[in-house]
Amino acid sequence: MNLKNIHTIYFVGIGGIGMSAIARYFATNGKLVAGYDKTPSQITSGLEELGIEIHFEDSLKNIPISFLDKDKTLVVYTPAIAKNHTELNYFLDNNFIVLKRAEVLGKITESTFCMAVAGTHGKTTTSSILGHILQPVNATSFLGGIAENYNSNLILGEDKVSVVEADEFDRSFLQLSPNIACVTSMDADHLDIYGEAAALEESFVEFANKVSDTLIVAKGLPLKGLTYAVNELADYKA
């Protein structure tokens, strides 16, 4: 699927921090965007200011007619959406192109020089700093939080270089193809998804193996790469 040929994009769970960054990206690149979320928020208000139509009731009657043409519409959803969600199941049952958020992020960044930041802690701060540093060279950054100096979770640049906050939830980061990646930490988290810490660690190892160029890791993590530390001997230290 070539995203350049998709002109209408509907988000199920558009108010999520990761979903809203992608919605901003498409809207500011001239795509027609709309979506559903459970409750209004500052994030959904910001999206509406961009001209994105959002509703807060799970009902087919609320889907704008422009998004009911399955040959022209991409549907993006978050794994946090309930399996019995009426709108999502309508799109699935009627053979729309339906992709998870992580799959779409992977497709957006696959043709860029991608720098991904993963870790159970520290990835939002690190990716925000990296995105800010690379803003003068027109990198596009997808963040997992609102950067105060940009008032956004998207730093929009060109499509040559990207910075991505790589989320381990639901193994989402395995949809990325990073050239350079950083892993800040690997604590036992999301065990409702992974079941045990060993499975989480295996997922990080799989992510590390997808890096085509350079992997940078906090010292002490069970991954092979350049190391960094504070007041300890490492490849890079402060």
List PLM regions with ranges.
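ATP-dependent carboxylate-amine ligase
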Residues: 1-54, 70-75, 91-96, 128, ...
